[in-house]
Every structure is written in structure tokens, then in C-alpha cells.
Amino acid sequence: EAAAKHAWLLEHERELAVASKAAPGAVELVRALHAAGCRLGILTRNAHELALITLAAIGIGDCFLTEDVLGRGEADPKPSPDGLLRLAARWDVAPQKMLMVGDYRFDLDCARAAGAQSALVNLAENPWPELTDWHARDCAELGRMAGLLV
């Protein structure tokens, strides 16, 4: 019974992943970061395979190495810093040189716990200023703040 429920959940999540739409400015920001030579990773509570489907559906799958997409089976869930620290180790970079971009407190908590910088996006107001290094209404605004988008 548990296997059947898991299979149903994955199929439901797969349907959502295929139909995914990018947040405003996200595709442009990711493409600009990728073009600038930035190493990009994903930390998600979704399954790894579904994250890859989502990235492909919104047209940025080619900007991420498969092993840099960490789903619920590859790292402890946020707010644990586990996933961010795994990426830092894989990339041989200090967490302090990394920026965690997210839309919820757990993303910001994850960044703080890892020693990384944080950017809160897709919220008009910032309910967690003590955890936020950067705040932008959307990814396009974050890209402009970083000098990557006009």
C-alpha cells in the first residue's frame, strides 16, 4: 500500500512538474548567471527526477548539472544547511561565497546555517529582514540589482 501511495504521489508531482511555469524573471536571471560562468544548484523538497523535469519544462535544464540538483533523496530538507554544504564541498567553494535564492524562510534559514548569503525573491514585502541579505520583488529585479539584467 505504501508503494502504491508513493507511486501515485510521484505521478501527481510529475504532472505538476511538466506543467510548471517559471517565476517572473527567473529564466532570464538563470541564463544570465549561467552565461557569466556561475555554478548553479537547486535544493528542493521535490524528488530529484521531478526537479529535472521542472527545469526542462521552464527551459533552463541545460544550465544545471544533474548532480547539482539536490532533491529530497539527496540532502536533508531545508532549513538544514546540508544541501548547501554538499554543493559547497562539491564545488570546492566556501559557503560564504555562495548565494541562496529562495522565496521562503526555510531558504533563508538554510543560507544562514551554512554561512552563505541569502536573497529573498517573489515577495513584495520582506517578513524576515534579519535573515535576508538581498530582497527583490522578483528574479528580474534581483538580476538588475546584481547588474546582470537591464
Segments (PLM) and residue ranges:
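Metal-dependent phosphoesterase signature
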Residues: E1-E28
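Short, surface-exposed loop/turn motifs that are enriched in glycine and acidic residues
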Residues: L16, L40-G41, G73-P77
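Glycine/serine-rich loop-strand microenvironments at binding/catalytic pocket rims
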Residues: S20-I42
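Asp-based, Mg2+/Mn2+-dependent phosphohydrolase catalytic module
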Residues: V27, R31-A35, H48, L52-V150
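Conserved phosphate-coupling serine/threonine residues in phosphotransfer and NTP-handling enzymes
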Residues: T44-N46
